[in-house]
Amino acid sequence: MNLKFLKSLSSLALAILFIFLVSCKETKENKSEIVQQENAEISQDSLFFKLSLAQWSLNKPIFSDELDPMDFAERANDLGFEGLEYVTQFYAQRINEAEDPEEEMQVVLDGLKAKSEEYGMENLLLMIDGEGDLASTDAVARNQAVEDHKKWVDAANYLGCHSIRVNLFGAEVPEDWKNSAADALKKLSEYAKGKNVNILVENHGYLSSNIDLLVEVMEMVDMENCGTLPDFGNFCLKREGGERWEAACIEEYPKYEGVEKMMPYAKAVSAKSYTFDEEGQEEIIDYKKMLKIVKDAGYTGYIGVEFEGNEVSPKEGILATKNLLVKAGKQL
């Protein structure tokens, strides 16, 4: 009896010791995580830029219905961001399929505005997709695209966003593309001027990623509220099979040169990321070099995290990009 009792007592003691050690380990890890988060927050105060989150970083959980796009402000706040960059295609189907699209648009905007206020977030810009080709050589189609973008200018004004991001798809001949793009941008920027909204062109593939041509377009438009949104990674000029997306890139504009040439017209900046090495560095983009270009241009606004990788979860990729921006920014 005594021997059995001693064995039971010994087993109980070992179990208690194990639980105690695990508890201590978790407590230390939690404290370490909290300290790291606090240090990151403190370090952000000394940066030359603020951090925003591009909603596209969450496209996978949104498309798989794991995340309601209406909860974007809450998720961005949880991840430690201050600003929001919305992607309109996440709301377009709901709006377009409604019995009264105009009324549904207002419901969506009211919801987004309420959420941003609830979580103390700043609405920065709307990324517009699927509203027509602004660089089309067909004047009727081009003007219709301008008209279709105007509702999002109104939406940006209502939400308090400073800009909308547009694409310049359409013509494939450089001279035709420049003339068509400049025409559409002038018309849209003129409308947006009265709404206190900027029209920003992102390098988003093909001729819009040929930054020499894009700069010419900016000079042709020559309006204060028409500018650029440099993206660290979107410099593909041509893909296999002539595809717009997905296919392998076979020709690319020099990315650092491209960002440097876009910065004089920049009113927002997008920090694209894909994969990271063991030290947390982006594997194909030198973030310190990119941030130096941005800082040297005198930019002090928001930099938006836009993670597009597949090797880690969206949350992990977003935080890795955010941490890299903070780390690289502190070194400048």
Where are these regions (language model features)?
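N-terminal pre-domain/capping segments
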Residues: N2, L21-Y158, S163, D176-N179, ...
